[in-house]
C-alpha cells in the first residue's frame, strides 16, 4: 500500500512538472475593430415636387448633403494571399442624398459600377445573392422594429419589415409583402447584364411612404429619433470578389447592427 501511494505521488509530481514545463499555448483572438460614433445623416425637407425617374437631375437634390459609402473590409480573415489579391481591386464607390416631403422619404444614389448586373425578374427577390443592390435600413429608436429596403439597377425592389431584432429574420424575409406605395426608379449608364463592355454606373431613387413608417407609432418628422444605414452589394466580372460598402461604418460586417446606424437629422 505504501509503495502504491509513493508511486501515485511520484506520478502526480511528474504531471505537475510537465504541466509547468509545457509551453503555454495562446489562443489568438480576433480584435474587434474600434469605430468612431456614427456621424449623423441629414434629410432635407423640400417644398418642390419631385418626379422620381432615376436620374437625380432635379435641382432639389442639390439642397441635400452628399454622403459617400465606405468599402467594407469583409475579407480580412481570408488567407493572406487571397486577401492580398482582393485588395488589388479598385474600389467602386457610391454617393447618396436624402430629402423628404409630406408624403415620402426620397433616397437618391449615384453608383460607380463598371459592370452593372441584375439577374432577378420580379420584386421581393433576394437580390443580394447575385445582383447589384442598394439597401436602406430605417429604424425608429423608440421601437424594436425596423425596415430593410432594396433598390436595383433594373428598378426592381424588395421591402422587409422586422417586428423586432430578437425574432428570427428568416420568416419575415421570406413572407414580407411589398410595402404599399414603395417605389424605385433606376437608370443605367451603360448596358445591363453585358459583361463584354465597360459601364459607367447606375443611378437610383427610392421613395418610401411616410404613412407606412408612421403606422408603427413613430412619425417621420423633426422631434422623433430615427437611425439609418445605406449598404451596397457590387457584383462584377471586373472584381476578384464581390464588394460591399456602407455608410456609416460598422464594427463588423453585418448590416443589422442597429446601434451603430447613423442618427437621422431633420432639416
Residue ranges of model-derived segments:
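Bacterial N-terminal signal peptides
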Residues: 9-19
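Bacterial N-terminal signal peptides that target proteins for export
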Residues: 1-11
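Structural preference for beta-rich elements and adjacent junctions enriched in aromatics
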Residues: 21-267
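Secreted/luminal cysteine- and crosslink-motif detector
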Residues: 3, 19-22
